[in-house]
């Protein structure tokens, strides 16, 4: 008869006890930053009864990161052209106008202006 194999829970408990005895530090888990919770909140505002798969969330997260990097790079370039060392909301606004097409840029600028106004009024 083969020997009994310990369950996963028992193995984890045994390894924790071993680590505690030998004075080893527990390996700290690295936090993964993403926009997932914010994407989910917006999805629920727009379509409350709709869900999103993890693969679709990963794609959306990549999209937000890509757009963020493009806007930051363009704003940095604009600040450099104008011999400025600070990226202000004006550079961000101009970068958005340059990167996004037509109506999308108008909506993005109006939403951005609204967000900045809300932030400054709450201070």
UniProtKB/Swiss-Prot annotation:
Pfam families the UniProt entry points to: Histone
Phylogenetic lineage: Eukaryota, Metazoa, Spiralia, Lophotrochozoa, Annelida
Compartments in which it is found: Nucleus; Chromosome
Residues bearing carbohydrate: 110
One Gene Ontology cellular component: nucleus
Function: Core component of nucleosome. Nucleosomes wrap and compact DNA into chromatin, limiting DNA accessibility to the cellular machineries which require DNA as a template. Histones thereby play a central role in transcription regulation, DNA repair, DNA replication and chromosomal stability. DNA accessibility is regulated via a complex set of post-translational modifications of histones, also called histone code, and nucleosome remodeling.
GO molecular function, one term: protein-containing complex binding
Domain of life the protein comes from: Eukaryota
Free-text description of this protein's post-translational modifications in UniProt: Monoubiquitination of Lys-118 gives a specific tag for epigenetic transcriptional activation and is also prerequisite for histone H3 'Lys-4' and 'Lys-79' methylation.
Positions of the UniProt region annotated as Disordered: 1-31
Extent of Basic residues compositional bias: 9-31
Principal location class: nucleus
Keyword tags: Chromosome, DNA-binding, Glycoprotein, Isopeptide bond, Nucleosome core, Nucleus, Ubl conjugation
Crosslinked positions (Glycyl lysine isopeptide (Lys-Gly) (interchain with G-Cter in ubiquitin)): 118
InterPro entries to which the protein is assigned, alphabetical: Histone-fold, Histone_H2A/H2B/H3, Histone_H2B, HISTONE_H2B_site
Gene3D superfamilies reported in the protein's UniProt record: Histone, subunit A (1.10.20.10)
Family: Belongs to the histone H2B family.
Subunit-level organization: The nucleosome is a histone octamer containing two molecules each of H2A, H2B, H3 and H4 assembled in one H3-H4 heterotetramer and two H2A-H2B heterodimers. The octamer wraps approximately 147 bp of DNA.
Name the UniProt record assigns to this protein: Histone H2B
